[in-house]
Amino acid sequence: MDRLFVSTRKGLFSLVRDGSWWSIERVSFVGDAVSLAMFDARDGSLYAALGLGHFGVKLRRSRDLGASWEELPAPAFPKQPEGAVDTLPDGKPWPWRVEQVWALEPGAGPGEIWCGTVGGGLFRSRDAGGSWQLVRGLWDHPKRKEWFGGGADLPGIHSLSIHPGDPRQVVLGVSCGGAWRSEDGGDTWALSSKGMFAEYMPPQRRDDEAIQDPHRIVRCAAHPERLWAQHHNGVFRSDDGGRSWVSLDARPSVFGFAVAAHPTQPDTAWLVPAVKDDERVPPEARVVVSRTRDAGKTWEVLRRGLPQTHAYDIVYRHALDVDATGQRLAMGSTTGSLWATGDGGDEWTCVSNHLPPIYAVRFVA
């Protein structure tokens, strides 16, 4: 049975598909903000990251698809060295504090999980979330000092992509701090934003790799050298595992937050366009999905089943997902609307208009 987990401002929704229709099976953590959920197919565990305001970031794990939960320690920074001063580029203090879990991905080793956070820390667990270690190779990199917040006060790691054939190769995305790449399993890191550009910076820093704002980076599982990035200033494609990027002319807009890569067809990807910067609404107040099937040379604008009048839904960076077949997609919006398609995006069905604001969606086959 196909299953979809929807993370929202007011809980985690588990949906199941019976034939062509999705229905809500269970709601967990009602009233609590759930930033992400991750299913680990290796042992059937489901993880949920919560943000409880004054009580901080929490992590939960379920062994029965959400019927019951246990608490795990949340990733946390080590104690900041006495007398050490860490500041953002604007001179404000940079506290060693996890403000949100913003990326969760299974690793290659037994019990290995990677976690990116708002706060800028990259963490790794080797015991299925029982404990977490800060990845010092990235945190101690001198270029990390150039990162700054993109929509939040602190920088955040939102995308983690592990090469399926060589888990030593890891690509991640930072808002705002560019794309980064490790080829030794996280021991050392290098900037990997060549080809991206930042129109929000002075001209002399437009191409600076350390201050780029990729909103989301994803990879084609079957052809892992092909990656896609939805950036603040455009859409980019990499053909060399993220080492370099080329700009693409998507329509009706190159701005947005989400991008999804077809799992087996490297030339196919989907975007959810929006208008930057002050408005942040769909172009012409019409919700559409843009799809390319020729590596970004041309784009189809898909709108059947999506609202085309006075629609002000924004789809956040983790709120678009594609399943292992490459045919089923789901996306959720800031207004609590959830849509699904079973034909690659040609036609969409509204699953609900009444959910809380949606942060993330993720399929489980």
Segment roles from a protein language model:
Residues 1-365:
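Extracellular glycan-interacting surfaces
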